[in-house]
From Swiss-Prot:
Family that this chain belongs to: Belongs to the RnpA family.
Underlying gene: rnpA
Catalytic activity: Endonucleolytic cleavage of RNA, removing 5'-extranucleotides from tRNA precursor
GO biological process, alphabetically ordered: tRNA 5'-leader removal
GO molecular function, one term: tRNA binding
Subunit structure: Consists of a catalytic RNA component (M1 or rnpB) and a protein subunit.
Claim: Plastid is one of the keywords in the record: no
The species this protein was found in: Ureaplasma urealyticum serovar 10 (strain ATCC 33699 / Western)
Protein name: Ribonuclease P protein component
Entry EC number(s): 3.1.26.5
NCBIfam families, A to Z: rnpA
Origin: domain of life: Bacteria
Top EC group: hydrolase
Disulphide bonds in the chain: none
Amino acid sequence: MANFISLKRNEDILNIIKKQQKIHSNHIVVYFCETNLKKVRLAISISKKKFKLATQRNRIRRLIKAWFIAANVLVESYDIVVLVKPSFIDGSFVLNCDNIKKILQTIISKHKQNKINK
């Protein structure tokens, strides 16, 4: 999972959110959609209204990227948008890492179900 590219264009992020495939937990919401690329494209959205300090937002971004690397789950050909909730700061690194791992496994299982149904 270490091979991911950052999604930067607002248009791309909005297209993923409009497709309405999402999984949520107490601390984050993950929108995803399948693509033809061989790599994962990742966007992390953190609201300035909820997290005032830039250092806090940057730390959250680094933690989320570290989770995706630490999760070590093979998800390919997906665009993923992560929205961070204000309750994010309350969770520990290990708990949130397990949470990301479960979310990625859910994405993989939905992907397998879609392939079976087609």
